[in-house]
């Protein structure tokens, strides 16, 4: 009987997600044993600067992927939005379970909604994507960077000068806190989610046929199709945490994958937004990226990256 070693970050949310996946896999095949290996990533260690300044995407997965490649673990559970567009050679996303709530959630003092927050109010987020879209709607607000796990950020809202913070609804839901703390859910037409937000990525070695066979029973086709379009868009735009980029796909009544892509300037003053639909998720993602690039989105991404490079020198 095989014991499957599962890599996970140490945070409460990461461990909750990993244990949920293990329980589901045990239901599918009770003959496997699972053992969790906690791994500390660079993103967990560096908490005093914004993600965009320390390398963006991959910060929460690189050490875990190294453990996979060195066969120290057999599989890993990640938040899909943390996954870079391109994986290391030899690794695959073996499974994408059914997506949780993809929306962003506003948690505020006094349970105020976004339009009720006072002029000049301070919003805490560590995401350029969120801050750009919030500033586009409410340019009078002040963005203040906030880092740390979900529980740390909720504590900072209470003890520091934030009027509100924005978190992924999925994380709050998985922790069982969504109903208690959320002041307002920000719908995708108002704040477009990050690529893959709300979905989990179960990563393993491409050569592990036994695990891939087990995972095949756990993959959600709807989530797989929509996330594939979003990730193709991210890859084509060459975006990461350094740039305000968003992508969210759904399946329309013609059974087509319909993707909305967005690229913004960090101040929210310039926003490019396009929609593409079709049956091939990869093609849709690339087409949406091409449409936006023609209008100037790619040039905006390059200029934002250049500014960040100069700031870091």
Curated annotation (Swiss-Prot):
Bound cofactor: record note: Binds 1 dipyrromethane group covalently.
Superkingdom to which the source organism belongs: Bacteria
Keyword 4Fe-4S: no
Pathway the protein contributes to: Porphyrin-containing compound metabolism; protoporphyrin-IX biosynthesis; coproporphyrinogen-III from 5-aminolevulinate: step 2/4
Further information: The porphobilinogen subunits are added to the dipyrromethane group.
Quaternary context: Monomer.
Family: Belongs to the HMBS family.
Protein name in the entry: Porphobilinogen deaminase
Species for this entry: Bacillus velezensis (strain DSM 23117 / BGSC 10A6 / LMG 26770 / FZB42)
